[in-house]
Amino acid sequence: MADGSNREYLNLSTGQLVELALARGEGELTANGALVAKTGERSGRSPNDRFIVKEPSSEADIEWGPVNKPFEADAFTALWNRVEAYLADKDTFVSNLEVGASKEHYQPVTVTTEYAWHQLFARNLFIVPTEFNAADKPTWQIINAPGFVCNPERDGTHSDATVILNFAERKVLLAGLKYAGEMKKSMFSVQNFLLPAKGVLPMHCSANVGSDGDTTLFFGLSGTGKTTLSADPKRFLIGDDEHGWAPGGVFNIEGGCYAKCIDLSQKNEPVIWDAIRFGTVLENVVTDENRVPDYTNSTLTENTRAAYPLEHIAQRKEENCGAEPHAVVFLTCDVSGVLPPVSKLTKEQAAYHFLSGYTAKVGSTEMGSTAAIQSTFSTCFGAPFFPRPAGVYAELLMKRIESFGSQVYLVNTGWTGGPHGIGKRFDIPTTRAIVDAIVSGELKDVETEYLEKLNLHVPVAIPGVDSNLLNPINTWEDKQQYAEFAQHLAESFQKNFEKYQVPDSIKNAGPNA
């Protein structure tokens, strides 16, 4: 429609957006009906290009540093105006959406995009309300202009692209980026800032619920199994990535899923496989000559994605919310092969491991990361998205666990019998059997063995799981080497934890170096 008419398309349906995306050459239809789009050189988040406007209303509550970098308010206004002027002679797509499946805690947001497929993504991942902004709250605005090229000297940005959050003006500016995940993570960061002030814990986790209403949460970084394990054929999905835990219940912050597609198989992940159909956006997935997606192909990126609305999942919780969780699972992908497949945590240990966020970058979502797998500590299992000091979130977690009596487990979806390259990764059926035992409550009062170096209690038996796997030293041929690796891991935990100002009860809840 680039005929000079400069239309603003408001609240278009899925079919209309797919039609326009194809007509405008933004993507192609695949054999399974999904729309596939390419994002160019930025096929993941760009953390170096993310800023928060430094202004009086929020300045004192933000933990400024390499994750939350300050941006001048005047420079933001000038850049916002420049991007608006750039979009003024383009067709744009606009939707009125919400973030937060809670009458009390939702945020209304108007999303304006240059691309039709970005608008489809926003409508898949955010919530399309039956009545927009029923409580008449002040509305957030997102502008996404991938064709706008930033000039660092003129605009004060880090590169030719940027993501900037402005809490005072309720604005999110995305310029120069095609990777759609930036939109969802921006509004997640917004809720991560706003919710704690209302006593609600925002969480980088997935959630599902059983037929008797029991909720389980799965925390973890990208690639650790959040989406795979929460998409359980025996349970109902609440959401796969972002939730709030308020007194009385858990709610999804989103209205869709953003699942990793690399090596996706119908056998191992039937729920995700079946959700990829007309209306789904596939990002950077390579197709063959018949337009059949090749999920094993990582030519463009390891971080291939499918964005679909929750409606594409048959077994889901209609209201996108649930009761407070009986079980909370911290997923860690241990590349050293030292951690047991499952441990039971006290509330102090839960706070310790929540703050530590130990895991590996597996098929990292960040731009420029190589395929090499490395261990990392990511505070709250999602450091890039939490604007407030980490202690704020840890305190809220302990409060919620204590008041409801949730049991927390540390589950290793990484390696055993040796580090990455020598040992082998726990297979999905083993982890599923462990998770089944957790959600059924079988592990709540199970007999445990104490691993002193790791300061962890591990079950001695779990139905459907080889008991030899439960204490990791049994899976290593060289026991001395295991002891050395365990010592090294304990030391790295302690070194990482030095930065936290927390009570001794939490400080002493980690591994013993």
UniProtKB/Swiss-Prot annotation:
UniProt-recorded name of the protein: Phosphoenolpyruvate carboxykinase (ATP)
E.C. no: 4.1.1.49
Any Gene Ontology biological process: gluconeogenesis
GO CC terms: cytosol
Encoding gene per record: pckA
InterPro entries to which the protein is assigned, alphabetical: PEP_carboxykinase_ATP, PEP_carboxykinase_C, PEP_carboxykinase_N, PEPCK_ATP_CS
Entry function: Involved in the gluconeogenesis. Catalyzes the conversion of oxaloacetate (OAA) to phosphoenolpyruvate (PEP) through direct phosphoryl transfer between the nucleoside triphosphate and OAA.
UniProt keyword Hydrolase, yes or no: no
Enzyme category, top tier: lyase
